[in-house]
C-alpha cells in the first residue's frame, strides 16, 4: 500500500515541509547560498520528520485491523484530536480502502476547537470514498472531567480565535463546549474498540492524559499517537503514565530546540518541530474485540 496515490501526496507534502524547514534553519537562509547549503540539504534525506512517525502509526493501525479475525463484526475506528481538515482521518481511510477494501466498516471522529472547520471536514469526507456518513466532526475542547476554570475559559477563547485565523475559516463567534474524553466517546457512541487515538492538541496532551484516562484507554484503545509540545521533563512523565499501565512505547522523541542539533533516530538525524510519543496497548486486538462482543453496552 506504500505505492498508492494517496501516499504519494503525503510524501510530496513531507518533502516540501522538510525542505522548507531546512532552508529556514540556515543562517542567512536561501538556496543560493552555495555549496555549504546544498551539502546541508543533501544530508537531510530521506525525508523524515515527526509526521513520518504519525504515518507509520496510522498504517500500522490499518494493518493490524486487517489481520483481526473479528473485523467483520466491528468497524475500524480512529479518533483524531486536533484534526484540522482531518488529514490523518483521510490518510487512515485511504489505507483502509487499499488494504481491506472500500466495503470495510469504519467510524471516524475528528475533534477541533475551531467550529468553522466543520464544513471543510464534511467536504473532505464527500471527496473520499468511504468517509461520507462515517465521519463526524466535533467542535470542542477536551479537559479532565469536562470542567475548566474561568481563567482557562478565557484562554480557550483566545486559542479558538487564533486557530480560526490559522485555518482561514469564518469565525461565527461560537463558544465551543468542553467535555472529558469519556464524555466525548459516549456523546458520539463510539465502538468499544478504537484502533487509533491520534492527538495533536498544542500542549493540552499533558492535562488530557491523566492516570484515570490512561486506565480507561487500556480497556478499549489499541494504539495512541501523541504529538507533544512540551519541554524537558514533560514527555517522560507522560510516557511513564502509559508504561505504568504496561503500554509499550513504540516511538519517543522530544521536540527539537531551535538552536539545538537534530536528534538521532534509527532513520538518521531528525529535527522535530513537535515531539512524538507512540504507545501500543498490551491487550491484543482479539482480546479487546472479544470483550466488545460480550459487552451489551458501550464501554464508555
Label every model-predicted segment.
Residues 1-300:
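Phosphate/nucleotide-binding beta-alpha loop and adjacent structural elements of enzyme active sites
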Amino acid at each position: 500500500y506504500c505505492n498508492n496515490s494517496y501516499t504519494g501526496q503525503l510524501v510530496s507534502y513531507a518533502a516540501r515541509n522538510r525542505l522548507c524547514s531546512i532552508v529556514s534553519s540556515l543562517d542567512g537562509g536561501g538556496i543560493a547560498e552555495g555549496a555549504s547549503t546544498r551539502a546541508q540539504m543533501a544530508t537531510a534525506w530521506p525525508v523524515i520528520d515527526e509526521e513520518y512517525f504519525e504515518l507509520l502509526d496510522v498504517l500500522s493501525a490499518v494493518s493490524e485491523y486487517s489481520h483481526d479475525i473479528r473485523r467483520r463484526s466491528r468497524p475500524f475506528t480512529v479518533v483524531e484530536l486536533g484534526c484540522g481538515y482531518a488529514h490523518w482521518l483521510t490518510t487512515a481511510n485511504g489505507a483502509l480502502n487499499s488494504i481491506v477494501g472500500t466495503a470495510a466498516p469504519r467510524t471516524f471522529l475528528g475533534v477541533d476547537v475551531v467550529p468553522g472547520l466543520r464544513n471543510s471536514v464534511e467536504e473532505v469526507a464527500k471527496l473520499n470514498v468511504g468517509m461520507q456518513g462515517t465521519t463526524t466532526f466535533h467542535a470542542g475542547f477536551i479537559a479532565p472531567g469536562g470542567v475548566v476554570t474561568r481563567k482557562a475559559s478565557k484562554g480557550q477563547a483566545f486559542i479558538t480565535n487564533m486557530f480560526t485565523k490559522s485555518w482561514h475559516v469564518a469565525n461565527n463567534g461560537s463558544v465551543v463546549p468542553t467535555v472529558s474524553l469519556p464524555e466525548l466517546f459516549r456523546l458520539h457512541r463510539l465502538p468499544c474498540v478504537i484502533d487509533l487515538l491520534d492527538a495533536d492538541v498544542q500542549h493540552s496532551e499533558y492535562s488530557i492524559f491523566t492516570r484515570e484516562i490512561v486506565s480507561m484507554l487500556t480497556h478499549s484503545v489499541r494504539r495512541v499517537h501523541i504529538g507533544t509540545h512540551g519541554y524537558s521533563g514533560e514527555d517522560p512523565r507522560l510516557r511513564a503514565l502509559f508504561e505504568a499501565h504496561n503500554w509499550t512505547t513504540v516511538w519517543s522523541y522530544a521536540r527539537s530546540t531551535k538552536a539545538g542539533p537534530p536528534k538521532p533516530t534509527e532513520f538518521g538525524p531528525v529535527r522535530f518541530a513537535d515531539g512524538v510519543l507512540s504507545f501500543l496497548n498490551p491487550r491484543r486486538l482479539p482480546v479487546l474485540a472479544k470483550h466488545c462482543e460480550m459487552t451489551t453496552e458501550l464501554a464508555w
